[in-house]
Amino acid sequence: NDSERTTICRKFYKHLCDLFIESIKSFTISEKKLTKRFVIKNPELIDSYALKNQSVIVVGAHYNNWEMFAQVTPLYHQHSCFGIYKKLSNDFYNSKMLKSREKFGFCMFSMNETLKCFRQKTTKAIFFASDQSPSNYKNVIWTQFLNQNTAVQSGVERLAKLYDYPIFTYHITKIKRGYYQA
């Protein structure tokens, strides 16, 4: 009904504005404030692999505040934390985004540098936000989603098998305005 649609629309735009403001704030946020606003639950699940010198893959989505997630991740994990990203077309905003994400030790690799990332000689956690439409339809898996054929990326699975890395997933939950957990 119209009332429900209006409510959903208002909540969406409020959340979108929050993400925009939080993204701007992420350029100046301190480590102390960041760890207060974003908590990672059960980091020991992934860290148990770091203790065995085993690298891992962590997969999630562009959901809630993934920018804060990228910043806070190295503060919670013993692995070197690497992220794979798609380069923005605007060089200015691309460099700002990289600077923000790498602020507390997260190391970014462009999609073209994925294999370079995997070849780094360190125990690492490699993070993917794999929720976007595949750019190459040659190596996709087709499945039914919302009653239609949908292409799903298969690169993470292939890389995990090739390098024998376990895969973990993350889900970001908004606790309240400006506060999250994964």
Residues covered by each model-derived region:
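Soluble catalytic domains of membrane acyltransferases
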Residues: 27-182
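Negatively charged linear elements and acidic catalytic determinants
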Residues: 1-36
